[in-house]
Amino acid sequence: MIGPKALPVTIISGYLGAGKTTLVNNALRKANGLKLAILVNEFGNLAIDEDLIIAQDENMISLAGGCICCSYGNDMLLSLKELTSLDNKPDHIILEASGVAIPSAIESSISLITECFTESIVSIIDCEQIQDQLNDKYIADTVISQIQSADIILANKADLIKSDSPFHNWKENHEVLNKAILVSHSDVDLDIFLGITRHYWSPNTIIKKADKGHTNKFWSKVFFPYALVDPKKLSEALTQSNLFLVRAKGHVSGPDAKIYEVQSVGHRSYIKLANKEKLPGLVLIGTKEHMDFDLLNQGLKEFGSFSA
């Protein structure tokens, strides 16, 4: 179980030129009060848009909206611990890996400390380049490792691929990439990229959030768990691959009558004790491309329903 004060870390991976930096800049522009900490190996490797920068010193860049960018150099874990010890702690840490880094190795390092946990690994691929990269004997192993360790795969630069391109058929028949989300200019809702933010989780807004919906690529629904649901079993059920859920987050009343926060992203799930009293309910997000509500109801029926 995740500690109640542990900070979530999203690892961004992807080969050189896939669109990682653009994804970071988009996240900063969409933060809307969420305090993000961007962690990079060297400042020179991340081109933060100038209009987002408020101040800069040797170790930290102050950004609009209370966000910050830090360089971790040779000691990533020390930098993570320093972020968690700030008086004004970030809500979420985004760690941009280098283009040739293996994200599962970064995740293993993060697991050595209790102050943070890996919330998700997001891998970006370049729609135009991915087939050539997977056939390149020098880089294929790296690209495959980045893809296989991902909870969410963003297939970027989709606007450059024609509708009749063989890429689409190749993607759908690929064992892993068939779940990739097509995006352009690394533009994706923050709900999808980082998870549903803390601002949405009051009793008065949980249903409004799901009703609001997303772009035409996604659906969202509120799931109402029964009383005294086992949070571990529910979190495991949410990661069933045939449900094609992108993310789920919410609260349940456990068998011990305590309130637990339950989250899932891709094949990853985790639970923690809620630090405040919350009403039971989860928001589920999936892609319309793989929408099957009959299958969803069947997979989750022992835990609750989609009507109050």
Roles of regions detected by a PLM:
Residues 2-136, 141:
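Nucleotide-state-sensitive switch-loop elements of NTP-binding domains
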Residues 284:
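Flexible loop/N-cap segments at domain edges
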Residues 145-280, 288-308:
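C-terminal accessory "lid"/substrate-recognition subdomains
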